[in-house]
Curated annotation (Swiss-Prot):
Transmembrane segments: none annotated. Keywords: Repressor, Stress response, Transcription, Transcription regulation. The keyword Repressor applies. Belongs to the HrcA family. It comes from Thermoanaerobacter pseudethanolicus (strain ATCC 33223 / 39E) (Clostridium thermohydrosulfuricum). This is Heat-inducible transcription repressor HrcA.
Length: 343
């Protein structure tokens, strides 16, 4: 049965008050604090109906009501409908004019989001196949040092510093750049391994002494490109919530953040917009008391990762949805502007 306007107002009042106080709320409090225009008795009857319909819960017989997961879901869906139709403008000045390591930019935005929201944030970095490597560049920084730069077809950059056992003439770098791009960029993992194991040393000739460093660095870059990295920030914010004053419950939360495989599944994008999972909607038992707000970030419209906020079900969904929406749009714009062109 759909909720009428009166029930909606009462449900929103209960949720708003509970988010602020973490205490069950009664009909008299709603009548006094919120301009609903109904008597305490009428509100009490409506709250009983909302409880029977599954939108509210009564933790103790003598206490007021608190929102259920179903109640939060109704509230969140109404917020998301507004955001689909009315995207807020980007307002945070967090842009940098330098090209930075991709992962570090994402981590910075996750850190900013944690500081703004006072919640724990988690970020998922992209997992890529070797044949997504678009370009390799060796940049000399000294006679015995070079930067090994990998650029993927989405523009994501990885860089590594190579310390060589001997000095290298700078004229060799053009040869190396051409060779590595010909043999690695756009090639399958099998072809790359065959080149490294069978051909590289021979092709380097008298420069074979740098083969070990190159092979180790290339293998490391391939390994890291295929790994899904999970980053968490603002982990201590959970202790600010009364629900997590219990040390056992707090410990379980920190153990959850250490479970990277679980977080990897939690952050797997399921919709191409803001996705909210509330309490029992989460498929993992460890997250039945938590809510997750997550959304993807993109490079030129292509999804490359996910950022999420994790906290108690009693969270300010309207504020947090707004914050994560703005921050991921800003992050996507920044990444697209930095990695739009070839380096």
């Amino acid at each position: 049965m759909p909720l009428d306007d009166r029930k909606k107002k009462i449900l929103y009042a209960v949720i708003t008050d509970y988010i602020m106080t973490a205490e069950p709320i009664g009909s008299r409090t709603i009548a006094k604090k919120y301009n609903i225009g109904l008597s305490s008795a009428t509100i009490r009857n409506e709250m009983a109906d909302l409880e029977e319909m599954g939108y509210l819960e009564q933790p103790h017989t003598s206490a007021g009501r608190i929102p259920s997961d179903k109640g939060y879901r109704f509230y969140v869906d109404s917020i998301l409908r507004n955001y689909i139709n009315n995207d807020p403008p980007i307002s945070y000045n967090t842009r940098e004019e330098i090209i930075a390591e991709f992962d570090e930019i994402v981590k910075k935005y996750a850190r900013i989001l944690a500081n703004i929201t006072h919640h724990t944030t988690v970020a998922k970095m992209p997992k890529l196949n070797p044949d997504r490597i678009k370009k390799i560049q060796l940049i000399p920084v000294a006679s015995n040092k070079m930067i090994f730069l990998v650029v993927t077809d989405t523009g994501i950059v990885k860089n590594y510093l190579l310390n060589l056992c001997q000095n290298v003439d700078r004229t060799i770098f053009e040869f190396l750049n051409n060779l590595l791009n010909e043999k690695i960029a756009g090639k399958s993992e099998k072809d790359i391994f065959e080149f490294l194991q069978q051909d590289l040393r021979q092709m380097l000739g008298e420069m074979a002494f740098i083969a070990d460093e190159l092979i180790n660095t290339i293998l490391l870059s391939l390994k890291q490109l295929q790994e899904t990295d999970i980053y968490a920030d603002g982990t201590s914010h959970i202790l600010d919530f009364p629900e997590y004053k219990d040390l056992g419950k707090a410990k379980n939360f920190f153990n959850l953040l250490d479970n990277k495989s679980l977080l990897n599944e939690v952050l797997e994008p399921e919709v191409d917009f803001i996705d909210v999972r509330i309490g029992s909607e989460n498929k993992f038992e460890e997250m039945k008391d938590l809510s997750v707000i997550k959304t993807t970030y993109k490079i030129n419209g292509r999804v490359v990762g996910t950022i999420g906020i994790i906290g108690p079900t009693r969270m300010d969904y309207r504020k947090l949805i707004s914050e994560i929406n703005v921050m991921t749009k800003e992050l996507s714009n920044l990444l697209s502007s930095i990695y739009n062109d070839e380096i």
